[in-house]
């Protein structure tokens, strides 16, 4: 019985991984598409959370992932593409990938923006082959309510993250363990 469960689990993992690889290549967007979607996503975030605009004005870099797709049934994966902006200019393109295992089911899309508040945090991203959220510079995930309490004295973290525009149904959403890698566009 245990062997049957193990084989079924491994088969599921192989199928999910194979499907995810074909989906992620189909999801690959052009630089123009990423730029357009990132501009719209950032404008939407600034409209809903005015405090994010204040952070954006002080940030050394803003990494915008306008749309990330997460899907899973026991095994899960997520993928999205984004752009790093410094002083309003696009300076690099990145993808974010995560895999998970556990009690989960569903499909969801969402976006997130990382505000890099220090030069050292931006440098860490630039020199990393795969920047993993949760390792390296400190990251604070903010929602609309928590953003209202942010001041110049409390805002001392390396990176602030906002998750927004969640659509679909999936239990469990987080950034921990996401790997961010530079890509050519």
Name each region found by the language model.
Residues 16-25:
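C-terminal segment of classical bacterial N-terminal signal peptides
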């Amino acid at each position: 019985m245990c062997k049957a469960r193990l084989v079924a689990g491994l088969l599921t993992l192989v199928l999910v991984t194979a499907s995810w690889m074909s989906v992620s290549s189909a999801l690959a967007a052009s630089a123009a598409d990423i730029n357009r979607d990132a501009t719209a996503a950032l404008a939407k975030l600034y409209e809903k959370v005015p405090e994010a605009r204040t952070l954006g004005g002080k940030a050394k870099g803003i990494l915008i992932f306008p749309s990330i797709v997460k899907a899973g049934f026991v095994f899960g994966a997520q993928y999205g593409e984004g752009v790093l902006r410094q002083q309003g200019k696009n300076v690099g393109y990145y993808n974010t990938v995560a895999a998970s295992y556990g009690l989960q089911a569903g499909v969801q899309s969402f976006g997130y923006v990382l505000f890099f508040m220090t030069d050292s945090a931006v440098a860490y991203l630039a020199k990393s082959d795969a920047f993993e959220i949760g390792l390296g510079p400190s990251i604070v995930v903010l929602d609309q309510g928590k953003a209202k309490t942010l001041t110049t004295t409390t805002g001392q973290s390396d990176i602030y993250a906002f998750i927004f525009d969640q659509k679909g149904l999936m239990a469990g959403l987080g950034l921990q363990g996401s790997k961010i890698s530079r890509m050519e566009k």
